[in-house]
């Protein structure tokens, strides 16, 4: 039975962690490599870096961060943000990323997913889907793809797009509810379930985690294969080890071996 994965996520801008992290003993809370080391020691199954730097000039900084993180950490690393070409994917993989997440570029050109998957293998390619519910109350649920941090509507149905990019060769889908993101009110379980039911590739639930029960629900109710969270880990509400124990107690298959530091940050 495949184990459910817990994936902390770090937003990186201009080479620094945005929204910071609070870890005891961390020399530099703004250094993504230092934060990654903590999550690696804590037993995170994977780590996700999302680069929200606007300028292309800063890509060299991101590649350096990926390289230093890959050297220092054992856990798999997914990197996304600003990926526009097959060459961008190649550069990140060469720097040490295990997977590359494609967002806006996949919406503009779904065949980019096919080209990247053909060249590097589907297991390396994640498509990040940012969606908002657009159906009126009482109507069948429907979600639209938004790009550029949830600002720009596309008119594209999220579930249909998920099917398309899975067929194009995406090995995994990172599904974020823009309605729920930052609310700490739990994942949009209907969105997660609709997409996980529509595709055969793994789905990562993202956006809205407020507590450990939300992680359980993402899998048990949303059908996700992995759960992504940020604030509950960054700010010390729970450790990765506590999250794994809670999910295992709920009957989910978790990887409990290996490093499992229960240390967490002061609130």
From Swiss-Prot:
Range of residues in the leader sequence: none
GO CC annotations, alphabetized: cytoplasm
Enzyme Commission number(s): 4.3.2.10
Catalysed conversion reaction: 5-[(5-phospho-1-deoxy-D-ribulos-1-ylimino)methylamino]-1-(5-phospho-beta-D-ribosyl)imidazole-4-carboxamide + L-glutamine = D-erythro-1-(imidazol-4-yl)glycerol 3-phosphate + 5-amino-1-(5-phospho-beta-D-ribosyl)imidazole-4-carboxamide + L-glutamate + H(+)
BP term (GO), one: L-histidine biosynthetic process
Record-linked Pfam families: His_biosynth (PF00977)
Subcellular location: Cytoplasm
Keyword annotations of the record: Amino-acid biosynthesis, Cytoplasm, Histidine biosynthesis, Lyase
Pathway the protein takes part in: Amino-acid biosynthesis; L-histidine biosynthesis; L-histidine from 5-phospho-alpha-D-ribose 1-diphosphate: step 5/9
Top-level taxon of the source organism: Bacteria
Single annotated GO MF: imidazoleglycerol-phosphate synthase activity
Main location: cytoplasm
Catalytic site positions: 11, 130
Functional note: IGPS catalyzes the conversion of PRFAR and glutamine to IGP, AICAR and glutamate. The HisF subunit catalyzes the cyclization activity that produces IGP and AICAR from PRFAR using the ammonia provided by the HisH subunit.
Family membership: Belongs to the HisA/HisF family.
HAMAP family for the chain: HisF (MF_01013)
Subunit structure: Heterodimer of HisH and HisF.
Protein name: Imidazole glycerol phosphate synthase subunit HisF
The organism of origin for this protein: Methylobacterium radiotolerans (strain ATCC 27329 / DSM 1819 / JCM 2831 / NBRC 15690 / NCIMB 10815 / 0-1)
